[in-house]
Amino acid sequence: MTTTIDGNEVGDGIREDVSDSVETLREEGVTPGLATVLMSDDGASKTYVSMKQQACDELGIESYHHEIDPEAPAEVLFDRIDELNADPDVHGILVQMPVPDHVGERAVLNRIEPEKDVDGFHPENVGRLVAGNARYKPCTPHGVQKLLEAYDIETEGKDAVVVGRSDIVGKPMANLLIQRGPGGNATTTVCHSRTQGLDEKTRNADIVVAAAGVPEMIDAEMLSEGAVVIDVGINRVDANTEKGYQLVGDVDFESAKEKASAITPVPGGVGPLTIAMLMYNTVKAASLQSGVDVDLP
């Protein structure tokens, strides 16, 4: 019997923990604050920012939103980030990607103070993650860990394959899986577009994390019997629907569920955890910066 992992249920539990911690902080006169910065006309980016603002409102986190003309010089964005770095009411800063080419993603990430980098992508925070002393774990990989934990899926001693090597998911996911402690101690292989014999590697895995951004690339033929399959992908494909498309993951769900012992659907699997973990990191940032302890599991 295959278990379909319910990301909404797990995400709701994390939000409850975050809400309790927000209350603890507020009782001590600290209101967690998250600043979102948008320098794009992209509709999907606007939607993502709106979802993050809504989550803040629901959990009692102060949301500060800033929009910058995509044609503006890079210095306009950098000056705004500097202002937010200096603002004691702002505990977390998130610049929604992508940013225009003339700005550059790396320059933006370097500009945010590490203590306020609640995405966990500043070089200092990446280094701390690799060293096993993470300040803020990147939201999506941390969310995957929470899903595995919630469903009592053991990682210790298991063979894990991460398909995808992005800075956002693939690399940090692999780093979390190899760390000592709960949710880690796995023997981890990272595969990517240049990997030879991908199907052989995934068939030898106890846990497969698909994060390549290729629709339905993983099917049952690429899996071992009883594998745990975590689908991080979210892709729009043409479909005969009212919107003209449907969302699918990097895994062929209908095929893979016939072999998997546990699998995440798309949507409703990993997605709800990404924003929940952003709220988690924001509250952790407020706790670290204010010195008020909170009980975040």
Which residue stretches match the model-derived regions?
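Anion-binding alpha/beta catalytic cores of soluble intermediary-metabolism enzymes, centered on
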Residues: 94-155
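Short glycine-rich anion-binding loops that position phosphate/pyrophosphate groups of nucleotides
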Residues: 96-102, 214-216, 234-237
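Glycine-rich phosphate/diphosphate-binding loop of Rossmann-like nucleotide-binding domains
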Residues: 39-41, 46-50, 135-232, 243-255
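Active-site cofactor/substrate anionic-group-binding motifs, chiefly glycine-
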Residues: 45, 49-89
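Short beta-strand segments
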Residues: 38, 94-98, 231
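N-terminal glycine-rich anion-binding loops that anchor highly charged ligand groups
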Residues: 23-34, 40-58
